[in-house]
Amino acid sequence: MTEHKSGFVSIIGRPNVGKSTFVNRVIGHKIAIMSDKAQTTRNKIQGVMTRDDAQIIFIDTPGIHKPKHKLGDYMMRVAKNTLSEIDAIMFMVNVNEDIGRGDEYIMEMLKNVKTPIFLVLNKIDLVHPDTLMPKIEQYQSYMDFTDIIPISALEGLNVDHFIDVLKSFLPEGPKYYPDNQISDHPEQFVVSEIIREKILHLTSEEIPHAIGVNVDRMIKEDEDRVRIETTIYVERDSQKGIVIGKGGKKLKEVGKRARRDIEMLLGSKVYLELWVKVQRDWRNKVNFIRQIGYVEDQD
């Protein structure tokens, strides 16, 4: 009988290298927020990939960056603390970019870690194959990796091969989650992340990191309909105007796009109510950060 493998794998890397895209690809559902704006992942989002012979729990850590406020401090602590909890580390980089100071900082952080470390070169669909080997040699000059795998999370290229390699390094173990469970976050959290993703896609550079989303109420009204009441928090009146848009058009579009994804997630019709409120300087208010769902694990 084939042994069953299971383990926890941390995905670490600079902002916007494709970590969330990878999680959504291997899980087959939208769990992690995807956006072209940096630093969009705020909580450790655990996606559970279950196969007949293995179960892998992926922890999508916030992108490494220099913190600018209390929320940023929190995001960095989550990323670093994750390294002590896992069976393997995926260090993901954008192969279409030069090695940056952020990459060097992460490799310095990883040098003393005993856990198996895989260098995952993402976005190979954007580069010529001839450029891969020089890039691999560059990274190898910084540190030794357990293995180096080029992939495209967006296109799915080489992803299955990487999963097979990863499985071979994981210990024998049980299924930690039921077959049909794809995340350890409550549905309310995933819903709030979907809404935040749509806002990021539809608003300008000024807005992204000033956005907080809280699901105030989520109730099943009947067998085929869920009512969701949500508050979107911004830091300034001008940002509130941008999110709402002229005549409420922007907010309406956010609701329309979010509802579509939420209905797929829940398998029910959704009535989605969105409110926008100003909470000045909320990213520096620790209690408020906790209130809207960014909570550190307690030992």
Curated annotation (Swiss-Prot):
Membrane topology reported for the UniProt record: Peripheral membrane protein
Residue numbers spanned by region G3: 60-63
PROSITE patterns, per the entry: G_ERA, KH_TYPE_2
Domain Era-type G: 5-172
Family, similarity comment: Belongs to the TRAFAC class TrmE-Era-EngA-EngB-Septin-like GTPase superfamily. Era GTPase family.
Ranges where the record places region G1: 13-20
Primary localization: cytoplasm
Name of the protein this chain belongs to: GTPase Era
Region (G2): 39-43
Subcellular location: Cytoplasm; Cell membrane
Pfam families per the UniProt record, alphabetical: KH_2, MMR_HSR1
Boundaries of every KH type-2 domain copy: 203-280
Region (G4): 122-125
UniProt source species: Staphylococcus epidermidis (strain ATCC 35984 / DSM 28319 / BCRC 17069 / CCUG 31568 / BM 3577 / RP62A)
